[in-house]
Amino acid sequence: MISITEWQKIGVGTTGFGIFFILFGMLLYFDSVLLAFGNLLFLTGLSLIIGLRRTFSFFFQRHKFKGTSFFLGGVVIVLLRWPLLGMCLETYGFFSLFRGFFPVAFGFLGSASNIPFLSALFQRLQGTSSMV
């Protein structure tokens, strides 16, 4: 069993609220205040979950520099009240940063799902990479 500290539990909640505010801000026609608040909560929660040092080492790796610059640049653009452009930059940066994680996540969802259509879809999205 993996032990989770209280700070990590707070980080999971903060990240969840950040994702909620980002989605709610997009639902309300890219409300810049909700998007900015969601971005700040998401980044704060991520740093609470994995720690500041690991967060900085994740974002500032040499091969992830382009994704990091687009993601953090999008956050700054949203904070400057250009929400549509900022969210486009953030989305591109997010997919660039977490590109290696998606096959693992789809593989897990495919193996955890008992619904035949969804299982086949997630197995197809998984590609060649696997968890084992």
Swiss-Prot record:
<feature type="topological domain" description="Lumenal">
    <location>
        <begin position="90"/>
        <end position="100"/>
    </location>
</feature>
<dbReference type="GO" id="GO:0015031">
    <property type="term" value="P:protein transport"/>
</dbReference>
<comment type="function">
    <text>May be involved in fusion of ER-derived transport vesicles with the Golgi complex.</text>
</comment>
<dbReference type="InterPro" id="IPR007305">
    <property type="entry name" value="Vesicle_transpt_Got1/SFT2"/>
</dbReference>
<feature type="topological domain" description="Cytoplasmic">
    <location>
        <begin position="61"/>
        <end position="68"/>
    </location>
</feature>
<keyword id="KW-0472">Membrane</keyword>
<dbReference type="GO" id="GO:0000139">
    <property type="term" value="C:Golgi membrane"/>
</dbReference>
<feature type="transmembrane region" description="Helical; Name=1">
    <location>
        <begin position="17"/>
        <end position="37"/>
    </location>
</feature>
<feature type="topological domain" description="Lumenal">
    <location>
        <begin position="38"/>
        <end position="39"/>
    </location>
</feature>
<keyword id="KW-1133">Transmembrane helix</keyword>
<feature type="topological domain" description="Cytoplasmic">
    <location>
        <begin position="1"/>
        <end position="16"/>
    </location>
</feature>
<dbReference type="Pfam" id="PF04178">
    <property type="entry name" value="Got1"/>
</dbReference>
<keyword id="KW-0653">Protein transport</keyword>
<comment type="similarity">
    <text>Belongs to the GOT1 family.</text>
</comment>
<dbReference type="GO" id="GO:0006888">
    <property type="term" value="P:endoplasmic reticulum to Golgi vesicle-mediated transport"/>
</dbReference>
<feature type="transmembrane region" description="Helical; Name=3">
    <location>
        <begin position="69"/>
        <end position="89"/>
    </location>
</feature>
<dbReference type="InterPro" id="IPR045176">
    <property type="entry name" value="Got1"/>
</dbReference>
<dbReference type="GO" id="GO:0005783">
    <property type="term" value="C:endoplasmic reticulum"/>
</dbReference>
<feature type="topological domain" description="Cytoplasmic">
    <location>
        <begin position="122"/>
        <end position="132"/>
    </location>
</feature>
<feature type="transmembrane region" description="Helical; Name=2">
    <location>
        <begin position="40"/>
        <end position="60"/>
    </location>
</feature>
<keyword id="KW-0813">Transport</keyword>
<keyword id="KW-0333">Golgi apparatus</keyword>
<dbReference type="GO" id="GO:0042147">
    <property type="term" value="P:retrograde transport, endosome to Golgi"/>
</dbReference>
<protein>
    <recommendedName>
        <fullName>Vesicle transport protein GOT1A</fullName>
    </recommendedName>
</protein>
<feature type="transmembrane region" description="Helical; Name=4">
    <location>
        <begin position="101"/>
        <end position="121"/>
    </location>
</feature>
<dbReference type="GO" id="GO:0016020">
    <property type="term" value="C:membrane"/>
</dbReference>
<keyword id="KW-0812">Transmembrane</keyword>
<dbReference type="GO" id="GO:0005829">
    <property type="term" value="C:cytosol"/>
</dbReference>
